[in-house]
Protein backbone atom coordinates (compact mmCIF):
# COMPACT_ATOMS: atom_id res chain seq x y z
CA UNK A 1 0.00 0.00 0.00
CA UNK A 2 1.26 3.50 -0.80
CA UNK A 3 2.57 5.09 2.43
CA UNK A 4 1.51 8.63 1.46
CA UNK A 5 -2.12 7.53 0.97
CA UNK A 6 -2.16 5.43 4.13
CA UNK A 7 -0.62 8.12 6.33
CA UNK A 8 -2.40 10.99 4.56
CA UNK A 9 0.65 13.23 4.27
CA UNK A 10 2.35 15.21 1.53
CA UNK A 11 5.97 16.39 1.37
CA UNK A 12 5.92 20.11 0.51
CA UNK A 13 9.56 20.86 -0.24
CA UNK A 14 12.65 19.58 -2.00
CA UNK A 15 14.36 18.89 1.31
CA UNK A 16 17.41 17.30 -0.31
CA UNK A 17 17.94 20.44 -2.39
CA UNK A 18 17.32 22.86 0.47
CA UNK A 19 20.18 21.92 2.77
CA UNK A 20 21.51 24.79 4.87
CA UNK A 21 25.30 24.63 5.05
CA UNK A 22 27.67 26.51 7.31
CA UNK A 23 31.20 25.21 7.75
CA UNK A 24 30.97 21.78 9.34
CA UNK A 25 27.22 22.09 9.99
CA UNK A 26 24.26 20.88 7.92
CA UNK A 27 20.55 21.46 8.53
CA UNK A 28 17.95 19.46 6.68
CA UNK A 29 14.41 20.82 6.78
CA UNK A 30 11.53 18.57 5.84
CA UNK A 31 8.18 20.32 5.41
CA UNK A 32 5.08 18.24 5.05
CA UNK A 33 1.34 18.46 5.41
CA UNK A 34 -0.33 15.87 7.58
CA UNK A 35 -4.07 15.55 7.15
CA UNK A 36 -5.92 18.46 5.60
CA UNK A 37 -4.45 21.44 7.41
CA UNK A 38 -1.50 20.62 9.65
CA UNK A 39 1.86 21.66 8.23
CA UNK A 40 4.86 20.33 10.09
CA UNK A 41 8.53 21.29 9.78
CA UNK A 42 11.16 18.86 10.96
CA UNK A 43 14.71 20.18 11.36
CA UNK A 44 17.56 17.71 11.40
CA UNK A 45 20.81 19.34 12.49
CA UNK A 46 24.04 17.52 11.67
CA UNK A 47 27.48 18.52 12.84
CA UNK A 48 30.34 17.10 10.85
CA UNK A 49 32.79 18.00 13.62
CA UNK A 50 34.29 15.39 15.88
CA UNK A 51 32.54 15.04 19.20
CA UNK A 52 34.51 15.00 22.44
CA UNK A 53 32.64 11.95 23.74
CA UNK A 54 31.80 8.80 21.81
CA UNK A 55 28.27 9.16 20.44
CA UNK A 56 25.29 7.15 21.59
CA UNK A 57 23.56 4.90 19.08
CA UNK A 58 19.79 5.42 18.95
CA UNK A 59 17.32 3.44 16.90
CA UNK A 60 14.71 5.14 14.75
CA UNK A 61 12.07 2.62 13.75
CA UNK A 62 8.98 2.57 11.59
CA UNK A 63 6.88 -0.19 10.03
CA UNK A 64 9.49 -0.87 7.35
CA UNK A 65 12.95 -0.66 8.87
CA UNK A 66 15.10 0.29 11.84
CA UNK A 67 17.83 2.88 11.37
CA UNK A 68 20.70 3.22 13.80
CA UNK A 69 21.69 6.85 14.26
CA UNK A 70 24.75 8.23 16.02
CA UNK A 71 23.75 11.05 18.35
CA UNK A 72 25.76 13.30 20.60
CA UNK A 73 25.52 12.37 24.28
CA UNK A 74 23.22 14.63 26.30
CA UNK A 75 26.12 15.63 28.52
CA UNK A 76 27.97 16.96 25.47
CA UNK A 77 24.87 18.64 24.03
CA UNK A 78 24.55 20.42 27.39
CA UNK A 79 28.19 21.58 27.16
CA UNK A 80 27.46 22.78 23.59
CA UNK A 81 24.51 24.81 24.87
CA UNK A 82 26.67 26.44 27.54
CA UNK A 83 29.18 27.27 24.81
CA UNK A 84 26.35 28.72 22.69
CA UNK A 85 25.24 30.95 25.57
CA UNK A 86 28.76 32.39 25.70
CA UNK A 87 29.07 32.95 21.95
CA UNK A 88 25.64 34.08 20.67
CA UNK A 89 22.41 35.68 21.81
CA UNK A 90 19.51 33.27 21.34
CA UNK A 91 16.79 32.73 23.91
CA UNK A 92 16.34 29.18 22.68
CA UNK A 93 19.76 28.23 24.09
CA UNK A 94 18.51 28.92 27.62
CA UNK A 95 15.28 27.05 26.87
CA UNK A 96 17.26 24.07 25.54
CA UNK A 97 19.52 24.18 28.58
CA UNK A 98 16.43 24.23 30.81
CA UNK A 99 15.10 21.09 29.09
CA UNK A 100 18.48 19.33 29.27
CA UNK A 101 19.57 20.31 32.80
CA UNK A 102 16.31 20.77 34.70
CA UNK A 103 13.73 18.56 33.00
CA UNK A 104 15.93 15.71 31.70
CA UNK A 105 18.50 16.08 34.51
CA UNK A 106 21.41 15.58 32.11
CA UNK A 107 24.82 15.34 33.72
CA UNK A 108 26.70 18.63 34.00
CA UNK A 109 30.44 18.21 33.56
CA UNK A 110 32.37 21.43 34.15
CA UNK A 111 35.45 19.67 32.76
CA UNK A 112 33.60 18.88 29.53
CA UNK A 113 32.41 22.50 29.33
CA UNK A 114 36.04 23.63 29.61
CA UNK A 115 37.06 21.11 26.91
CA UNK A 116 34.26 22.37 24.65
CA UNK A 117 35.40 25.98 25.09
CA UNK A 118 38.96 24.93 24.28
CA UNK A 119 37.88 23.04 21.14
CA UNK A 120 36.09 26.19 19.88
CA UNK A 121 39.04 28.40 20.89
CA UNK A 122 36.89 30.46 23.26
CA UNK A 123 39.20 32.56 25.39
CA UNK A 124 36.70 33.38 28.13
CA UNK A 125 36.80 30.71 30.80
CA UNK A 126 33.58 29.20 32.13
CA UNK A 127 32.74 30.08 35.72
CA UNK A 128 29.41 30.16 37.49
CA UNK A 129 29.63 33.97 37.87
CA UNK A 130 30.25 34.56 34.16
CA UNK A 131 27.59 31.99 33.25
CA UNK A 132 25.07 33.79 35.46
CA UNK A 133 25.83 37.08 33.64
CA UNK A 134 25.56 35.45 30.22
CA UNK A 135 22.19 33.89 31.10
CA UNK A 136 20.83 37.26 32.26
CA UNK A 137 21.91 38.81 28.94
CA UNK A 138 19.48 36.45 27.20
CA UNK A 139 16.48 38.19 28.80
CA UNK A 140 16.15 40.60 25.88
CA UNK A 141 16.17 37.69 23.40
CA UNK A 142 13.62 35.56 25.26
CA UNK A 143 10.69 36.66 23.07
CA UNK A 144 12.45 35.05 20.08
CA UNK A 145 11.00 31.77 21.37
CA UNK A 146 7.44 32.82 20.50
CA UNK A 147 7.69 31.42 17.00
CA UNK A 148 9.45 28.24 18.16
CA UNK A 149 7.52 27.09 21.24
CA UNK A 150 3.77 26.56 21.29
CA UNK A 151 3.36 27.28 25.01
CA UNK A 152 5.55 30.40 25.08
CA UNK A 153 3.13 32.42 27.25
CA UNK A 154 3.60 29.90 30.07
CA UNK A 155 7.40 30.20 29.99
CA UNK A 156 8.53 32.65 32.65
CA UNK A 157 12.11 33.82 31.98
CA UNK A 158 12.91 34.48 35.65
CA UNK A 159 11.62 31.09 36.80
CA UNK A 160 13.50 29.21 34.08
CA UNK A 161 16.65 31.25 34.64
CA UNK A 162 16.61 30.52 38.39
CA UNK A 163 15.99 26.80 37.90
CA UNK A 164 18.88 26.55 35.43
CA UNK A 165 21.18 28.58 37.68
CA UNK A 166 20.25 26.42 40.70
CA UNK A 167 21.27 23.27 38.84
CA UNK A 168 24.56 24.80 37.67
CA UNK A 169 25.27 26.34 41.08
CA UNK A 170 25.19 22.86 42.59
CA UNK A 171 27.18 21.16 39.80
Task: State where each predicted segment sits.
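Structured mid-to-C-terminal alpha-helical surface segments
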Residues: 1-171
Amino acid sequence: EDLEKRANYEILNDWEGEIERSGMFRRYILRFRYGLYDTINIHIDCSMEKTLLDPDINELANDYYVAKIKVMKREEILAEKVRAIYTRHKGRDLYDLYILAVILKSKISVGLIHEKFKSYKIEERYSFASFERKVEELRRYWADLKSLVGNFESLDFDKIKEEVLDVFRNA
